[in-house]
A protein has these predicted regions:
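Class I SAM-dependent transferase core
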Residues: 131-178
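N-terminal auxiliary segments of SAM/dcSAM-dependent transferases
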Residues: 9, 28-147
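Non-catalytic protein-protein interaction scaffold segments in large eukaryotic complex-forming proteins
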Residues: 1-20, 24, 29
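Short amphipathic alpha-helical segments, especially helix-boundary/capping motifs
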Residues: 2-4, 16-19, 59-63, 148-153
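Conserved small/polar residues in nucleotide/adenosyl-binding loops
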Residues: 180-182
Length: 182
């Protein structure tokens, strides 16, 4: 994976959040090779900088425009945030027929990545955004443990990539539709 600028550089535990933020804003992709938990902290630190930047930008434009304009600007800011954070990537590799994340203190990703991506081919590797990997790991926990849906009175076990009913008002709304006679 390369960024729009075509550059990918290695980042590790010595990479500061300010340095990472500057590189990411220039379009560079950062291949994380440090400690797993430090990588998560780096993502949060870069996200805080993006939030501050959006707040400063938003304050200038806050009064200008309609509610629709504000909504569109918020969507643009979120898309930009996702695009920038998505350029912090990690390499997954196949080992013994399972996915492996070879970072210090990394969780076992074999089950989660196998569930989301399928079993790897021999020698296969995959470069994925760190944030996407976090989503895969979280979704796998939802799949294993289930998500309580009060409107149903039971748990559902969503797969990765499937809408998870974590916002009960959506399920309640669908449940209320059964009361309407069309």
């Amino acid at each position: 994976m390369t960024s729009t600028s075509g550059q990918t550089t290695v980042a590790d535990d010595t990479t500061t959040a300010d340095a990472a933020y500057a590189r990411l804003r220039r379009g560079t992709t950062l291949l994380w090779q440090g400690d797993f938990h430090n990588g998560r902290q780096l993502i949060r630190a870069v996200d805080r900088r993006l939030t501050k930047q959006a707040a400063r930008k938003g304050t200038k434009k806050q009064s200008a425009g309609t509610a629709a304009d504000l909504f569109l600007r918020q969507r643009e800011d979120r898309a930009r945030r996702a695009e920038i954070l998505g350029r912090i990537v990690v390499d997954l590799a196949e080992r013994d027929g399972q996915w492996l994340l070879d970072l210090h203190r990394a969780p076992d990703v074999a089950g989660a990545c196998g569930h989301a991506y399928g079993a790897p081919s021999r020698g296969e590797s995959r470069r994925t955004p760190f944030t996407a990997l976090q989503g895969v790991l979280g979704a796998y926990q939802w799949h294993l443990n289930g998500v309580e849906v009060p409107a149903l009175g039971e748990k559902v076990y969503p797969d990765y990539g499937v809408f998870s009913p974590t916002r009960s008002e959506y399920v309640d709304l669908v449940d209320d539709l059964s009361l309407i006679h069309i």
